[in-house]
């Protein structure tokens, strides 16, 4: 059963340049991952719609930053998949600039869901994404997708190895297994996202309240 968070999910906008990013006052959670790691499938599974985010057998198909609205001032942000060598160098460089700039400077971004294929986790580019995001001190949650491709015992070993690595090197990260095929790990991921959006939304409201109070307070000497 789809989590209530995603009940009214809908496409919002797509951009390919930083200057075109929407001027939202809400909370954003980014979904990032290596091409063909199962990012679009994970989004579709969470939302409960097969073609909500386009799934392609061709890696690197997501070429823009796609915004999906989950309700008032809450957005899932689907970032371009990285690491597909067949994409021309100029486009890969553009994506790199787009991704790093968005992740490091977007004020409304609360956290990142990082998608990794459980059979090939912690690639060089995955670590680069973690390094880009580390300086923001914002939370990261790793979904080890395609867990159905491994036996339960091997999946557990992979999970523990990744968790141990992240605990030592990226303590702001959490991790879980996930399978779109078996619809496994959906409840855990959905609840985490709900908590992130709730916490982020409360922070935004508090900041807006403080700004309003500052405007109401007369300057000394008035």
Swiss-Prot record:
State the needed cofactors, names only: Mg(2+)
Residue ranges of the EngB-type G domain?
A: 25-199
The task this protein performs is described as: Necessary for normal cell division and for the maintenance of normal septation.
Its BP terms in the Gene Ontology are: division septum assembly
Positions annotated to bind GTP = 33-40, 60-64, 78-81, 145-148, 178-180
Positions of Mg(2+) binding: 40, 62
InterPro entries linked: G_ENGB_dom, GTP-bd, GTP-bd_ribosome_bio_YsxC, P-loop_NTPase
Keyword terms, alphabetized = Cell cycle, Cell division, GTP-binding, Magnesium, Metal-binding, Nucleotide-binding, Septation
The record's annotation in SUPFAM superfamilies points to: P-loop containing nucleoside triphosphate hydrolases
Q: Which domain of life is it from?
A: Bacteria
Q: Which Pfam families match?
A: MMR_HSR1
Report what the protein is called. Answer: Probable GTP-binding protein EngB
Cellular-component GO terms for this entry: cytosol
What NCBIfam families does the entry give?
GTPase_YsxC
Q: Which GO terms describe its molecular function?
A: GTP binding; metal ion binding
User: Which protein family is it in?
Assistant: Belongs to the TRAFAC class TrmE-Era-EngA-EngB-Septin-like GTPase superfamily. EngB GTPase family.
């Amino acid at each position: 059963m789809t989590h209530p968070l995603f009940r009214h999910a809908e496409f919002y906008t797509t951009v390919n340049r930083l200057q075109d990013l929407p001027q939202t006052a809400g909370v954003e959670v980014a979904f990032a991952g290596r091409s063909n790691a199962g990012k679009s499938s994970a989004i579709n599974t969470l939302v409960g719609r097969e073609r909500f985010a386009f799934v392609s057998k061709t890696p690197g198909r997501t070429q823009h930053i796609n915004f999906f609205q989950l309700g008032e001032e809450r957005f899932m942000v689907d970032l371009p998949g990285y690491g597909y060598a067949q994409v021309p160098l100029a486009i890969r460089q553009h994506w790199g600039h787009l991704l790093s700039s968005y992740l490091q400077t977007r004020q409304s971004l609360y956290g990142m869901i990082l998608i990794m294929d459980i059979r090939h986790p912690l690639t060089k580019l995955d670590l680069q994404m973690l390094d880009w995001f580390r300086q923001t001190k914002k939370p990261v949650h790793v979904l080890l997708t395609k867990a159905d491709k491994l036996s339960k015992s091997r999946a557990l070993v992979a999970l523990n190895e990744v968790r141990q690595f992240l605990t030592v090197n990226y303590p702001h990260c959490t991790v879980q297994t996930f399978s779109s095929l078996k619809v496994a790990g959906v409840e855990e991921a959905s609840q985490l996202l709900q908590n992130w959006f709730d916490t982020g939304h409360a922070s935004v409201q508090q900041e807006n309240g403080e700004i309003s109070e500052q405007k109401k307070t007369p300057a000394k000497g008035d």
